[in-house]
Swiss-Prot record:
Subunit (UniProt): Interacts with UBP16. Interacts with ZHD11/HB29.
Subcellular localization, as worded in the UniProt entry: Membrane
Maturation-removed propeptide residues: 145-147
Domain of life, source organism: Eukaryota
Cellular component terms (Gene Ontology): plasma membrane
CDD domains: HMA (cd00371)
Pfam families, per database record: HMA (PF00403)
Source species: Arabidopsis thaliana (Mouse-ear cress)
Family: Belongs to the HIPP family.
Protein name listed in UniProt: Heavy metal-associated isoprenylated plant protein 27
């Protein structure tokens, strides 16, 4: 790598992979459905667009980046859009984390608690909480005797 390569280096774009992007967008009517479909049909690299209004789900297949598709849907339609946060019921490991059961989830799906940072992980007691709970225990000989 010489001086010439450093000075005249062109930024090579990373090749995009063919992928299937699933997005959750609330659609109330056929007009919303059409607007969501039209917002991504014109994107470069899109080969197939599928809209499922019952599940509020938009599926885009092609050589696209998921973040750019979500941004385009939000910008063109003015609707809140996010990557599909649900996974099939059989895929989630047991025991289920709190927040995995989402009432808005389609039948047969639960929220992907492992990939979703908004869902709280299992609650753990901090060191202070452990000290306070053991301080008033009957099993502890050094516990408070006033109570």
């Amino acid at each position: 790598m010489g001086f010439r390569d450093i000075c005249y280096r062109k930024h090579h774009k990373k090749l995009k992979q063919f992928q299937k992007v699933e997005i959750k967008v609330k659609m109330d009517c056929e007009g919303c459905e059409r607007r969501v479909r039209k917002s991504v049909e014109g994107m470069k690299g899109v080969s197939k667009v599928t809209v499922d209004p019952k599940q509020s789900k938009l599926t885009v297949e092609g050589f696209v980046q998921p973040s750019k598709v979500v941004h385009r849907v939000m910008h063109r339609t003015g609707k809140k859009a996010e990557l599909w946060p649900y996974v099939p019921y059989e895929v989630v490991p047991h025991p289920y984390a709190p927040g995995a059961y989402d009432k808005k989830a389609p039948p047969g799906y639960v929220r992907n608690a492992l990939a979703d940072p908004l869902v709280a992980p299992l609650a753990r007691a901090s060191s202070f909480e452990v000290k306070y709970t053991s301080a008033f225990s009957d099993d502890n000989p050094n516990a408070c005797t006033i109570m």
